[in-house]
Amino acid sequence: MSDISKQMNNLSVNDGANTVNNNNSFRGGRSQYVPPHLRNRQGGGNQSGSSSESSDVPFGGSQRGGFNSNGFNNNRGGFNNGGYNNNRGGFNNGGFNNRGNYNQSFGGRGGRGGFNNGGGRYQRPTPGVGKWQDGKHEPAPRNEKLEVELFGTADDSHFQSSGINFDNYDDIPVEASGDKVPEPITSFTAPPLDELLVENIQLSRFTKPTPVQKYSVPIVAAGRDLMACAQTGSGKTGGFLFPVLSESYMKGPAPVPESNGAFSSHKVYPTILVMAPTRELVSQIYEESKKFSYRSWVRACVVYGGADIGQQMRNMDRGCDLLVATPGRLKDLLDRGKVSLANIRYLVLDEADRMLDMGFEPQIRYIVEECDMPAVKDRQTLMFSATFPRDIQMLARDFLKDYVFLSVGRVGSTSENITQKILYVEDDEKKSVILDLLSANENGLTIVFTETKRMADNLADYLYDQGFPATAIHGDRSQYEREKALAAFKNGAAPILVATAVAARGLDIPNVSHVINYDLPSDIDDYVHRIGRTGRAGNVGIATAFFNRNNKNVVKGLIELLSEANQEVPDFLTKIAREGAFGKMTRGGGRGGSSRGPSRDFRRSGNSGWGNSGNSGWGNSGNASSSGWGGNSSSSYSNTNSNYGGGYNNNQRSNFSSGGSYGNQTGSNSWW
């Protein structure tokens, strides 16, 4: 054979027939052309008579070095570690919030670049996504694979439901005030809940409602607004997700307004809006909403700062009926014309007091009052938090109508499921003491709280050097780094998490058995929320705090909390509290211990201490310019203490917290 014949044979389009196996699923029959520059490459189209990759790779999946229907080597920097997967166009449901993830395979509409290969007219049914058709809710068929990913298995410790003390919640006092408060439910049944939601609750292995859930379900079903104060870890997330999803399943989506403008077809019209202060909290709420919206017509989305806004917008294009957002990122999307709030039926503010403390009041007021959101009378508003100080309640009147005030347990207090230990430890002895604590408690997960980001990094490095696998999260770490750290913590690869206040509020991480306040916060409310990371959902936990005279500003609040939770009060705390000089400092540092969340509805408080407001206007939903604060209530929050309202507008991040808990969160845009 001549040389030219040999070369032509090498270039034969039939070379490797019946052996090419790429993402186009070619397995035999007609030969497929393989470009010369890809021939004889490892992972390429021709493997000398053998297939290039396993035929089990799902459609759109990544093959390192191979080529698929979307082009050569579609792994766009794909990283797979502990469940995080950045494979764009993949079908891996194990990731956090990426393209090719759950938004595509579960919550998607078959949008651009997704499962339907380019957003064509034909849309293959998406697993786990139901529809609303002809005025009727049609749930999707069950999907065993999705159910394992969403709900885990009965013996999976990462899917914690209730603990050994869950029945004790029946003994917690509940106060519900307002006109004609609906009777609470006693179990998850249909009715009053939608049948599909009850099935999803059962898949989550929740056997009975917590006190806040017992009341929130009938309150929302009756069309009432709700302000709920409940112990941390008492099921507040389910307290708003259960009722709003149940009502949405029964009522269906609102009709989308007629398109106005060239880009209106790309605008999303969510029915439910949930706002929370941090990206960790909104991500957690989003993960829970995926469980309880499984098989329904409701598709959940999450948006927050510090992540690619373009990718978040593309995720929204696939369907956005329930939007979980931080105020800053939501305002950005509203300004871009990507989101319309015209169809909002349910507005939820979670950790409302913290959002205001962090300076989010201007954004929240803009979103609620200046955009196209329905008026107070045309929507239902729910506010949830573990604390509602008096000034926060007064501000909340602008967003609520004829609401029920729900106080569950000791509002602003801690759970008796948490054993609290206060140790007197000088600063230079803390590292030695924490090693002793960690050595004695090797089971479960431990969260260690510090006041500064530098200390968080230093302590995590120190513990790692001492043989304790530790990782850290704080405001200076990127979103990817924080997700990776949280994943390592949850799966036990790094069972010690060193964190600043960024992780103190709202995160529900199963199996946290020990919380250590390496640095005590200057605000007693922050202490409450930190230790609330353990003892959740009726489980028991231990909270240890290192105290010395640098923490004297919270001594009074600590004694109150320990006494209320039937915990031992150390003698050194009592001694320091009796020293008269320290009593004044409690009022100066943070909110101290004297202004923790109220347990009573202040609509009952009459004229005591409220200037000229009395009861007039407090029960109403009038605007903030009423005379409730001597004619200046609209500026009371921003001007009475410039450490709160004024901080954000001047971009002085260090002014967010009078006590300094958030003062060290420089550049905190990364976690809005």
Swiss-Prot record:
Any one GO cellular component localisation term in the record: nucleus
Biased composition (Low complexity): 14-24, 48-106, 621-643
GO BP terms, alphabetized: cytoplasmic translational initiation; negative regulation of cytoplasmic translational initiation in response to stress; positive regulation of formation of translation preinitiation complex; regulatory ncRNA-mediated gene silencing; spliceosomal complex disassembly
Any single Pfam family the record assigns to this protein: DEAD
Alphabetized InterPro entries for the sequence: DEAD/DEAH_box_helicase_dom, Helicase_ATP-bd, Helicase_C-like, P-loop_NTPase, RNA-helicase_DEAD-box_CS, RNA_helicase_DEAD_Q_motif
Chain spans, region Disordered: 1-142, 583-672
Biased composition (Basic and acidic residues): 133-142
Compositionally biased spans, kind Gly residues: 107-121, 586-595, 608-620
SUPFAM superfamilies recorded: P-loop containing nucleoside triphosphate hydrolases
Magnesium recorded as keyword: no
Principal location: cytoplasm
Domain Helicase C-terminal positions: 417-577
GO molecular function, one term: G-quadruplex DNA binding
Assigned keywords, A-Z: ATP-binding, Cytoplasm, Helicase, Hydrolase, Initiation factor, Nucleotide-binding, Protein biosynthesis, RNA-binding
Reaction(s) the record says it catalyses: ATP + H2O = ADP + phosphate + H(+)
Recorded domain comment: The Q motif is unique to and characteristic of the DEAD box family of RNA helicases and controls ATP binding and hydrolysis.
Family assignment from sequence similarity: Belongs to the DEAD box helicase family. DDX3/DED1 subfamily.
Entry function: ATP-binding RNA helicase involved in translation initiation. Remodels RNA in response to ADP and ATP concentrations by facilitating disruption, but also formation of RNA duplexes.
Protein name, as recorded: ATP-dependent RNA helicase DED1
Gene of this entry: DED1
